[in-house]
UniProtKB/Swiss-Prot annotation:
It catalyses: L-seryl-[isocitrate dehydrogenase] + ATP = O-phospho-L-seryl-[isocitrate dehydrogenase] + ADP + H(+). This is Isocitrate dehydrogenase kinase/phosphatase. GO terms for biological process: glucose metabolic process; glyoxylate cycle; tricarboxylic acid cycle. GO terms for molecular function: [isocitrate dehydrogenase (NADP+)] kinase activity; AMP binding; ATP binding; phosphoprotein phosphatase activity; protein serine/threonine kinase activity. The keyword Transferase applies. Keywords: ATP-binding, Cytoplasm, Glyoxylate bypass, Hydrolase, Kinase, Nucleotide-binding, Protein phosphatase, Serine/threonine-protein kinase, Transferase, Tricarboxylic acid cycle. It comes from Rhodopseudomonas palustris (strain ATCC BAA-98 / CGA009). Pfam families: AceK_kinase, AceK_regulatory.
Amino acid sequence: MTATASHTRARPLGASEIEHATRIAEPDFDLLDALYRTDDPDDQARLLARVVLSAFDNYYAVSRRIPALAQAAFEARDWPVTVRLSKIRIGLYTACIDQLVPLLKAGLPELTTDEQLWPTAEAELLAAIEGRYEADFAFAFWQSLRRKLVSDEWRPVSYDAGSTARRTTSPAAVLKTTATTLPITAEVIAGILDEAGFRVPWRDRDGDAALAAQAIETALEPLSPRPGEPVKIEIADSGFLRNRGACLVGRIKLRDRGDMPMRNLPLLIALLNEKDGLVVDAVLTDSDELQYAFSSTLANYHATNPRYHELARLLYELMPKRPLGTQYSCIGFHHLGKVAVMSEILAEHRKTKEKLATAPGFKGTVAIAFTMPSSAYVLKIIRDHPTDDYKFDYFDGLDEVLRKYNLVHEIDRAGSMLDNIIYSNVKLDRAMFAPELLDELLEAGIGTVTLDRGALVFRHLIVQIKLTPLPLYLANASAAESRAAVINLGDCIKNNAAADIFNKDLDGRNYGVSRIRKVYLFDYDAVEPLTSVTVSRDGAAPGEFDNGMVFRPQEMLEGLRIDDPGLRRAFRDAHPELMQADYWEGMQQALRDGKVPKVMNYPASRRLRR
């Protein structure tokens, strides 16, 4: 964040400015030439390590510039640029590797088969990155490039060599502390807002600070606060920016009082940049609400502080229901999150000795989903061919379905679609699998799964956060919980539409409910761009679709299979526009015009001005 705030509207970023700032530098051709020319194995190892590290440094420099650009776009209210920056960032890692791989293959083809060179070169790389903060990230980059060249199996390798082995990270290094006494005043909150340093005038800073202080005071009441009691407000020295919004994140700490233990309250101050100035839109003080705001179902945050380990640890402490690996992913460090998630899955198995078995719910027609009972994750493969219950006349095939899962990973998921981690060439011990699942994987996933002695090798493996399928949830939930879920289902469908995503298989079985009782779409084999769908105003013909691409809004409830009349009525009353063609055509036009629709990332009840 910047140190001071000015009172002039920020300048929009130009297209050439963004292109220049996010352009990946070319590989070091002098180093490449030296690598190609030498026949000495030690020189080859040393030069290969230098070439790859140079490429990583190019990537990392650009990736660290993007959060500052995102802040500038937020300050200028340049919403299309914020979306563009998110897309650039998420594709940057792969683009940088893809830039280098063909050069190495062409100039040193033996890299794909030389089993002696890689260990020696890896030792050179580890020595070169010793002591660097981002050493683990550089090593992840090395592993990614090696797999591209060698087509080796994916392993959750983390950087832990020598004296730079990372100990348990504390978030203290990224926290700024304000010490005061209860009650927390508007002046204290105003000071925290000023320290954020946005280069945008506030619409009503003092009024917002007063409302925020009041919201915090209400949230503290269950902790039995006393007037004059010492309190610390810890705020991350980082802006978190995403699309139209920004937020300040931290916690409020009340120390041990004798009759009360240490008490912590999560804190998120959500900011919007409106036409007439910066405003505090909401204050969140509940861990589950923070989890929704930082959900992997949303686009990733740009964090302006580069200390990603401390930020991920802070987020985990604030949202302990959410695995640590996904905390890395939600601030854009997918490849570190990828390592952390697989490490967590393997650790879960070692700890519980549970078997991977078919996931609860209805049998997937396109995917086979499996999990361990106490795991936080669900794993999936795509079938070679859909089951007989498949609804559509034509199946696009494995590669096209994987493309759709990748598409969802790369877009703003608008708070209503699970992110996916897609692994290639993963080997898992055969003993991890229940016999029935093992048989199904080998029979229905011949193009994806092979048996290699005592292990299963997955050509592709999709991992998602575990949800309860919506029909199962409704079968066991109370009337109030069920009503809230179907209303949230409508919000989910609207948010998907705002992200230009339409699920042509509008079946409740493709949606699930999270631990924090939010509804998400989690199956993507039937997703299409909303802008490519024909919305029909003619309800005469039966069925939802003609040729798979004509949508009749008036038939939505039949497609969702909500059988309970009361729940159908609740859905219809809460979201009547979803059954109207005007809504869908209006959303399509907004998307074609390049507008960025607003998406609600937190409960409306937490907004300061409703």
